[in-house]
């Protein structure tokens, strides 16, 4: 089982590859701040699917699941990633 903080760091790493100009470790709303758009969310999903061997459905690709680091980690937990 991975620690919550370790998962957060891995998600930050994936996000930083997608949008290196932003600091995703901040407690901000990524969507409202313009840090992620819909294409970025799809790219993030592909990275998360590959990293954690999970499948995030299209129905889950909504701003409510990707607007903060904690929400992304919670989605991973719902998809079966052991945290």
State each model region's role.
Residues 1-23, 74-83:
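Thiotemplate assembly-line natural product biosynthesis machinery
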Residues 60-71:
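AMP-binding/adenylate-forming catalytic domain of the ANL superfamily
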